[in-house]
From Swiss-Prot:
Molecular functions per Gene Ontology: adenylate cyclase activity; ATP binding; metal ion binding
CDD domains in the cross-refs: CHD
InterPro entries: A/G_cyclase, Adenylyl/Guanylyl_Cyclase_3/4, Nucleotide_cyclase
Domain Guanylate cyclase as annotated: residue spans: 191-300
Species assigned in the record: Streptomyces coelicolor (strain ATCC BAA-471 / A3(2) / M145)
This protein's name: Adenylate cyclase
Catalysis performed (reactions): ATP = 3',5'-cyclic AMP + diphosphate
This protein's record includes keyword Calcium: no
SMART domains assigned to the protein according to its UniProt record, in alphabetical order: CYCc
Transmembrane segments: none
Cofactor note: Binds 1 Mg(2+) ion per subunit.
Domain of life of the source: Bacteria
Similarity comment: Belongs to the adenylyl cyclase class-3 family.
Keyword annotations of the record: ATP-binding, cAMP biosynthesis, Lyase, Magnesium, Metal-binding, Nucleotide-binding
Length: 381
């Protein structure tokens, strides 16, 4: 919903250019689509982009930047905007004018919100229609059924969306507060894990599209549930791969092993391999970047099937937090010493086995470690 803003707004002398002539409405627009739009937006079309920007007191250039950031299509000067579009512009611009956000940050807010909700909206509509096996009335098409479904679900989903957003915002704010210093709010030490389905490309050639979609959905759903349940954060899903982060190495290790164990018990799933690295990570717009992330990805590519490889920094962190012994020999010595003193031996959740050093593209020579559970260990039910 962007426009060509050349020549729009005020010029260098403060003169306001005349309003562009509105484009004629598309006579081919589906009446049902227009009714559905009116239902969802809760208002009728009243403004062209130029009129909306002027009503909001925002320059055409800034309005266009916001709309592009939100992912809206170019509509020229068609009368397609509502009072809500004006209010949204006014609010974003107001945050900038009040000094609460810089202009660049306001654009980032618009972009992150647009990208997230665009995917959410596509997923919800597809899921609702896919799950509809029988129309409410005989002879109704799926297209015709969309209106009553949206009419019933819209208010409930809107409230649910705000609830989940507030919960996620509280959790994210809590992580920032716990980071302690200002530098760690953007650049933090995290454990980052990649989980990758082995042989996915070959599967795409053998499986029907519907079967492939079901497999990917099952993988993403299972991964998301396990990551969240164990206290990690799912950063993103890439079809055959998921990226997650955790504040501590023990949590990341537990998630990785549970993912491998869970997928191994599902006969419909290919083998899984996981790579984890620990170190400084830059966070931007919900994503993570940096050498640590790249290393985790490279470790995944060299990991054996149904196995977890970690980097040296991650192994050292597990040893430091007493989640894993430095070696099995060291664990045996500690157990013997504890027994001699009549004390309980230390209990470790994980075991680490150093692997051969090997070159990794773009990162030089690394020493991966194989992560497993200690004998007698196991994931929580």
């Amino acid at each position: 919903m962007t426009v060509d803003d050349t020549g729009s707004g005020a010029d260098g002398d403060g003169r306001v250019d005349p309003e562009p002539a509105p484009d004629s409405a598309d006579p081919g627009e589906d009446p049902l689509a227009l009714r559905l739009e009116g239902l969802i937006l809760g208002a009728e079309r009243r403004y062209t982009p130029f009129q909306a920007a002027r009503s909001a007191g925002v320059s055409m250039e800034l309005a266009s930047r916001f709309w592009r950031a939100m992912g809206f299509a170019d509509i020229g000067q068609a009368k397609a905007l509502t009072e809500a579009d004006v209010l949204a512009l006014r609010r974003l611009a107001g945050l900038v004018e009040a000094g609460l956000l810089s202009e660049a940050m306001a654009v980032q807010v618009a972009r992150s919100t647009g990208q997230t909700t665009a995917r959410l909206a596509e997923w919800q509509i597809d899921s609702f229609l896919e799950g509809l096996t029988e129309p409410p009335e005989p002879g109704m098409t799926r297209t015709e059924v969309t209106y009553p479904i949206v009419e019933l679900l819209l208010p409930e989903l809107q409230e649910f969306l705000v609830y989940v957003w507030r919960r996620q915002l509280a959790a994210s704010a809590g992580r920032v507060i716990q980071a302690g210093d200002d530098e760690e709010m953007v650049d933090r030490r995290l454990a980052v894990g990649f989980a990758d389905l082995v042989g996915f490309t070959r599967l795409t050639r053998r499986m029907e599209e519907e079967e492939l979609g079901e497999l990917v959905e099952a993988f993403e759903t299972t991964s998301a549930d396990l990551v969240a349940a164990r206290g990690g954060r799912l950063v993103k899903t890439l079809g055959d791969e998921v990226l997650y982060a955790a504040d501590d190495a023990g949590t990341a290790a537990e998630i990785a092993l549970l993912l491998v164990e869970t997928m191994a018990h599902d006969e419909t799933m290919p083998e899984l391999r996981v790579g984890i690295a620990f170190g400084t990570v830059t966070t931007r717009m919900g994503d993570v970047f940096g050498t640590t992330v790249n290393l985790a990805s490279r470790l995944t590519s060299i990991a054996p099937k149904d196995a977890v490889l970690v980097d040296t920094a991650f192994a050292e962190e597990l040893i430091r937090t007493r989640d894993a012994p430095a070696s099995e020999a060291a664990a045996a010595e500690e157990a013997a010493a504890a027994e001699k003193e009549g004390e309980e031996p230390p209990v470790y959740r994980f075991a680490l086995q150093p692997m051969w050093q090997r070159p990794v593209r773009g990162l030089g020579v690394v020493e991966p470690w194989l992560l497993t559970r200690r004998d007698g260990g196991g994931g929580e039910a």
